Amino acid sequence: MKVTLKELSQLLGATIKGDATLEITSVATLEDATQGQLSFLANSKYRAQLEATQASAVLLSEKEASCYHGNALIVSDPYVGFARVAQLLDTTPKETPGIHPSAQIDTSAILGDGAAIGANAVIGANVILGENVQIGPGCVVGESSIIGSNTRLWANVSVYHNVHIGHDCIVHSGTVIGSDGFGYANERGNWVKIPQTGGVRIGNHVEIGACTSIDRGALSHTEIHDGVIIDNQVQIAHNVVIGQNTAMAGGSIIAGSSTIGKYCIIGGGSAVAGHLSVADGVHISGGTNVTSVIREKGVYSSATIAMENKLWRRNTVRFRQLDELFSRVKTLEKSAKGSE
């Protein structure tokens, strides 16, 4: 696919600097770009690469464009502009519309126009697939589940029964949606399983990475709202609610019945304990353990930073002595006041 700078300027609302008829075929970094490619400068620390780039054109802010002598598209946010152009020129392979001969589809399932069902996929009873849904090889969609139009399941995704996924979503390989939540009652030391009879409700424009697990609700539903992005190997337990446009990085864990607000960022390897709520706009740093309610937006951290091992060992010992040291300081303060 080829597109001119003029066409891209119309897409982005950008100002053209240079040849409006120049054709672009793909995007690349400043360092790797060659003729026919569009690049971008979103961080001034890469300005030296801008001067040396072989890109045919560059997405720039107005400030950076004033010092650049090549072809440019001037935008308010070059990184967002890059994302939009990358979407336009995306060459990711798509499933061919139609049903592979090895796919197993229940006669009660409803398939929208343009749906693509890959090899060895299984579509259960009363499933509804919207228009242009892509179901990759080896996927399973359980009974009474609904998948909205233009949503794609990559190979080997498992969607259990009573799961609703909205339109324009992406679910990557190995992910499981709707497995049983970790619900058990303890009867004199023996675990009694609680049937997980809720479902999962996923909104529109949601992307879920590879090998992520989203448990079904115990009674009500687990909910992932519109615009949420979830990385690889994330665990979302039963009855969790993830608010609109929240981002969750790899390896993060949300325990059962916790609610995460809108526009939050959950850093990689972080964990939120069960039955808690996190306010809108909260940024949880990577590796943080959240064990109490967060009521106000802001950045929250708890992980110990990496340090040389000997220093870490000494500090760990001191941390264990912290309560004793605090008591000693209080005693010294009282003694000092008494001697005044």
UniProtKB/Swiss-Prot annotation:
<keyword id="KW-0441">Lipid A biosynthesis</keyword>
<dbReference type="InterPro" id="IPR007691">
    <property type="entry name" value="LpxD"/>
</dbReference>
<comment type="similarity">
    <text>Belongs to the transferase hexapeptide repeat family. LpxD subfamily.</text>
</comment>
<keyword id="KW-0808">Transferase</keyword>
<protein>
    <recommendedName>
        <fullName>UDP-3-O-acylglucosamine N-acyltransferase</fullName>
        <ecNumber>2.3.1.191</ecNumber>
    </recommendedName>
</protein>
<dbReference type="InterPro" id="IPR011004">
    <property type="entry name" value="Trimer_LpxA-like_sf"/>
</dbReference>
<dbReference type="InterPro" id="IPR018357">
    <property type="entry name" value="Hexapep_transf_CS"/>
</dbReference>
<dbReference type="Pfam" id="PF00132">
    <property type="entry name" value="Hexapep"/>
</dbReference>
<feature type="active site" description="Proton acceptor">
    <location>
        <position position="238"/>
    </location>
</feature>
<comment type="subunit">
    <text>Homotrimer.</text>
</comment>
<keyword id="KW-0443">Lipid metabolism</keyword>
<dbReference type="GO" id="GO:0009245">
    <property type="term" value="P:lipid A biosynthetic process"/>
</dbReference>
<keyword id="KW-0444">Lipid biosynthesis</keyword>
<keyword id="KW-0012">Acyltransferase</keyword>
<dbReference type="Pfam" id="PF04613">
    <property type="entry name" value="LpxD"/>
</dbReference>
<dbReference type="InterPro" id="IPR020573">
    <property type="entry name" value="UDP_GlcNAc_AcTrfase_non-rep"/>
</dbReference>
<dbReference type="GO" id="GO:0016020">
    <property type="term" value="C:membrane"/>
</dbReference>
<keyword id="KW-0677">Repeat</keyword>
<dbReference type="GO" id="GO:0016410">
    <property type="term" value="F:N-acyltransferase activity"/>
</dbReference>
<comment type="function">
    <text>Catalyzes the N-acylation of UDP-3-O-acylglucosamine using 3-hydroxyacyl-ACP as the acyl donor. Is involved in the biosynthesis of lipid A, a phosphorylated glycolipid that anchors the lipopolysaccharide to the outer membrane of the cell.</text>
</comment>
<comment type="pathway">
    <text>Bacterial outer membrane biogenesis; LPS lipid A biosynthesis.</text>
</comment>
<dbReference type="InterPro" id="IPR001451">
    <property type="entry name" value="Hexapep"/>
</dbReference>
